[in-house]
């Protein structure tokens, strides 16, 4: 059943040219449970940020595809719960492609230093270097610390993506 679900999701996303779903890509697919208790979570995004109407459009198309597939198994659309959504703030970046739309935003990044130790910094994503290549890097401007009421600037950090363990966009207060 898991393979049928994945096939339906990818089929719908591939067929979105010229529709509300154009430009949408799959971030992650999570399937929990089985039979009548199956819960399907589809996280999608675009390079400019996905809209609610796009999620609703894709949800309808994916549900239609799954219902056709499930009829052959004797199940109906009432036998599964489908949620199509955006990863949103507070969710870790999964795909390298997601970074581009977050340039300028505040991030909390956990990464491995050259010596193998782990470090966490918060700062603004300023740039993505060589995004199409293996040695891609992020340029993070760390949040400055305040000393005696004055903000002290911190130097930008360039982090290789292969050393990034977790990167989470955060809301600015």
Curated annotation (Swiss-Prot):
Species this protein is from: Chlorobium phaeobacteroides (strain DSM 266 / SMG 266 / 2430)
InterPro entries: Ribosome_maturation_RimP (IPR003728), RimP_N (IPR028989), RimP_N_sf (IPR035956)
Superkingdom in the source lineage: Bacteria
Pfam families membership: RimP_N
Record's subcellular location: Cytoplasm
Function: Required for maturation of 30S ribosomal subunits.
Keywords: Cytoplasm, Ribosome biogenesis
Any GO BP annotation: translation
Family: Belongs to the RimP family.
Name assigned to this protein: Ribosome maturation factor RimP
UniProt main location, coarse: cytoplasm
One GO location term (cellular component): cytosol
